[in-house]
Amino acid sequence: MNFAKYLEKYKVEWLGILVFTCLCHSSMLLSSSVGIDTEALIADREGLYKGWMLTGRPGLVWLKSLLVVDSFNPYITGVGTIFFVVLSCILWTYLFYRITGQENKCGILAFSCIFSAHTILKEQMYFKLQVMELAVCFCLVAVAVYLSHQFALTKKWYYGVLSLPCSIIAFASYQAFNSLYLFGAIACFFLYYYFHCLKEEENITGKQLWFYILRFSVCFFGAFLINQLMTKLFFSGSGYLNGQVLWGQESVGACLFNIGKHMLKVLLGTQIYYAKTFGVYFLLLVFFCAGLLLHHKEKKGKYLGVIVLILLFLAPFLLTIICGGEPVVRSQLVLPFTLSFMAYALFLFEIKKERYQRILHWSGVVLGVLTTCILLQYTLLLNYTDEIRYQQDEETAFAIMADIDRVQDEEKSYPVVFIGGHPAALNSSCIHGETIGYSLLDWDTKVEPQGYFSTRRIVGFMNALGAGYTWADAETVQTVKAQCGDMTNWPMEGSIQLVDGVIVVKLGDLEE
């Protein structure tokens, strides 16, 4: 069926998924709360865009211009993000349907609910300054992978050419989409091999399968190389991942240990960002794929079936391998997609005995519901945590601003320096994520030169609340920092002083 008929057939399911996605994310996305980095979009938009260009992320700037959302508007951003997340689920599941030819209502629900409820997606939702653009990129990668698949299958060159702009914009927006494209490509070959090649009467040769892989590779590497060349010629290289790469900083053995440790954490689900059912899904996938290979042992190219299964496991850990250890959580966007895909694929397997088929079906349903419920619990707790954090940040910021105004000269505005940090006072029901739960007044306090970058962030946040402060330069920060050792910590008397023409606010003691 074509795309319009696909939408029509599952319109009730998509409406339910839209409501579910709103439940997961609307309380955060549709609020006016400000998180880390978002204050820069409000207080220093041009500086933020320049920073994106300097770190090789021009795609975000292009998309903001294209979507006409270059200023902070949480309501347009929130509605747009929810829409594009649901649209990405529609596009990906339609791609899977076109490859397998199998209608899969339970798979659609499992894929979409697990993906929407995933805590890694929630961590990315926290960054409102870019979240709608990244949701658009999920859609762009789905379209790019679909067009690449059509090129690999039909050999029609224009499909490959059309895939390039979609891939390039996504790759130029966030480096994690390289991994997502690769996993999407491997997922396509997995579906094509296990649910098309093995089941068709036509005996597809190993040579044909290798050419399918080759044409897919041309699409990926073409987009990747164009993006790399464009970045080097017109923008600066990104240091986003460079700071996380441990190869060369630690021994090879230590890096291999770090990689294995992270893989084990994901498989066992030992923290809130890694689902406890990930390993179960993968083992089930291996079991049923092995059964298919044994059942169709007369087919050629069986070794490719084994290879694609190995790649399906390794692809989510591409960033882990590149970094030589666990990358930041928000860059692991491929993991929610991987888990969702495995949940979808489980419903595609068929067993001849009806009784066993029913057991498989209901096992998939139970596992999907269990996974969604576990993820949803943490996602909603992260929503609540951020709400409490922002209330604390806003109240504290207004109190500090009132104290600064009492020191500020009416005729002259002095630059402001913040020393130390002030953590949010969260309650016992809150949970800390990687960034969620941490105060804007207590971020970057350990980054050298200490006091400078944290001051820029705090001043940016206060300016987003309506203040008109300026921050001191790095040299001035170091000078006044040496003179504030005897100052008390805010909110004590004497915690805000005018020192050498600079207002110094001591929030806490600096760590050595």
What positions do the PLM features span?
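Transmembrane-helix signature of polytopic, membrane-embedded enzymes
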Residues: 96-120, 139, 157-158
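Intrinsically disordered, polar/acidic, low-complexity terminal segments
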Residues: 2-54, 58-59, 64, 68-108, ...
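Transmembrane catalytic cores of multi-pass membrane glycosyltransferases
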Residues: 24-81, 85, 89, 110-112, ...
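Alpha-helical transmembrane segments of multi-pass membrane proteins
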Residues: 86, 135-146, 163, 220, ...
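Alpha-helical transmembrane segments
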Residues: 93, 288-293, 345-349
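Hydrophobic/aromatic-rich transmembrane helices and adjacent perimembrane loops
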Residues: 319, 324-351
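Membrane-interface transmembrane helices that cradle and orient dolichyl/undecaprenyl
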Residues: 141-159, 194-200
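Signature aromatic-anchored transmembrane alpha helix within multi-pass, membrane-resident enzymes
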Residues: 349-379
